């Protein structure tokens, strides 16, 4: 009987520790995790030669975005994979930037370069989808781009492709910015189809906001 009681108390203690860990995990991630899209693009094991031998660690390239125009890239390094991913997520959130969108696509064609990576992005009509490779697709989906044509013209290395895609997105400009710089009406610098798509997307967003507040 004593052994059974001891075993039962040990199980209770283990269960208690597990519950405390679960609560800690929820408290650590909180609601932030549910509000963002996270994509792990690559995980690599690296080694460092020291006096006593080799020390191994892991690196993780992570993309984080809200699916509504905000996206960031992070690179984490740690002795364990989960810790490396967590560091990558934290860095990605610090590197957030806004991507100008017209409806579900980008504002104009653009090409970005980073190291040996070269990525070309072109707007696409609704229903086209994200036509892109794995690394570029992760960035575009996290940014909230649903219709786009992307092509890698340089290195196929995932890190280079990701940074080239980010460089291309950072080159995007809103029609208002171009019109103000040239001193022209917005109708003279943006196609009528683009302006129509933007009005429709703004109307849909306003309708969704009204339904949410009702």
UniProtKB/Swiss-Prot annotation:
Gene: rpsE
Role description: With S4 and S12 plays an important role in translational accuracy.
Region (Disordered): 1-34
Molecular function as annotated in GO: rRNA binding; structural constituent of ribosome
Description of how the protein assembles with itself and partners: Part of the 30S ribosomal subunit. Contacts proteins S4 and S8.
Family according to the record: Belongs to the universal ribosomal protein uS5 family.
Gene Ontology CC, one term: small ribosomal subunit
Source organism phylogeny: Bacteria, Bacillati, Actinomycetota, Actinomycetes, Mycobacteriales
GO biological process: translation
Record domain S5 DRBM: where: 36-99
UniProt cross-references to NCBIfam families, sorted A to Z: rpsE_bact
Free-text comment on this protein's domains from its UniProt entry: The N-terminal domain interacts with the head of the 30S subunit; the C-terminal domain interacts with the body and contacts protein S4. The interaction surface between S4 and S5 is involved in control of translational fidelity.
Gene3D superfamilies: 3.30.160.20, 3.30.230.10
PROSITE patterns for the chain: RIBOSOMAL_S5 (PS00585), S5_DSRBD (PS50881)
Keywords: Ribonucleoprotein, Ribosomal protein, RNA-binding, rRNA-binding
Keyword Ribonucleoprotein attributed: yes
Stated name of the protein: Small ribosomal subunit protein uS5
Ranges of Basic and acidic residues composition bias in the record: 14-34
Keyword Ribonucleoprotein among record annotations: yes
């Amino acid at each position: 009987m004593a052994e059974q009681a001891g075993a039962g108390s040990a199980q209770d203690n283990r269960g208690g520790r597990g519950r405390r860990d679960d609560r800690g995990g929820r408290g650590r991630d909180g609601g932030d995790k549910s509000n963002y899209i996270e994509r792990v693009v690559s995980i690599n094991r690296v080694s460092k030669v020291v006096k006593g031998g080799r020390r191994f660690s892991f690196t993780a390239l992570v993309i984080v975005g809200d699916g509504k125009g905000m996206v960031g890239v992070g690179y984490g390094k740690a002795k364990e994979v989960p810790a490396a991913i967590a560091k990558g997520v934290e860095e990605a959130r610090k590197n957030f930037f806004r991507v100008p969108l017209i409806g579900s696509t980008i504002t104009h064609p653009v090409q970005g370069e980073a190291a040996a990576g070269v990525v070309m992005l072109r707007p696409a009509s609704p229903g086209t989808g994200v036509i892109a490779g794995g690394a570029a697709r992760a960035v575009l989906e996290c940014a909230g781009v649903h219709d786009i044509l992307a092509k890698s013209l340089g290195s196929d290395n995932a890190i280079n492709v990701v940074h080239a895609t980010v460089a291309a997105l950072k080159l995007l400009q809103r029609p208002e910015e171009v019109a103000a710089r040239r001193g022209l009406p917005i109708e003279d610098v943006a196609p009528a189809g683009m302006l129509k798509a933007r009005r429709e997307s703004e109307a849909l967003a306003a309708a969704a906001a009204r339904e949410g507040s009702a």
